[in-house]
């Protein structure tokens, strides 16, 4: 089963943020596990919706802070958040139309790439500049 592995390089050095990011990685891995093992399609669909909502809420809070602090990279950062949410929606769609199995490794690669890029660059820059 594909997994997104937490790497030390994802850490931004802010304990609370690093904790939330570890939780996000855990949620994404639960998606892969549920899609592999859960037989109740409605339960999987509900879980996918919950994960999407939790990650969207985390992003909304982060984006609110960026707007309040007038962060100059806000638009790029928000666009990157939207990219992950789109990837999760793609997984939801693949589950719905029964194409997930043939695409699971591509999904895992996309998510792993997103985390490496986003945590190491965008979040690290944000937390360094704003101290959040």
Language-model features, listed with the residues they occupy:
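Small-residue-biased structural context
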Residues: 1-132
């Amino acid at each position: 089963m594909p997994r997104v592995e937490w790497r030390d390089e994802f850490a931004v050095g802010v304990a609370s943020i690093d904790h939330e990011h570890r939780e996000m990685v855990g949620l994404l891995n639960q998606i892969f596990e549920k899609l592999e093992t859960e037989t109740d399609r409605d339960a999987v669909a509900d879980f996918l919706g919950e994960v999407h909502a939790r990650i969207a809420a985390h992003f909304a809070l982060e984006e609110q802070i960026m707007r309040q602090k007038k962060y100059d990279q806000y638009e790029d950062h928000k666009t990157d958040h939207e990219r992950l949410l789109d990837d999760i929606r793609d997984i939801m769609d693949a589950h719905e139309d029964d194409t997930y199995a043939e695409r699971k490794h591509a999904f895992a690669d996309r998510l792993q790439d997103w985390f490496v890029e986003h945590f190491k660059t965008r979040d690290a820059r944000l937390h360094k500049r704003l101290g959040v």
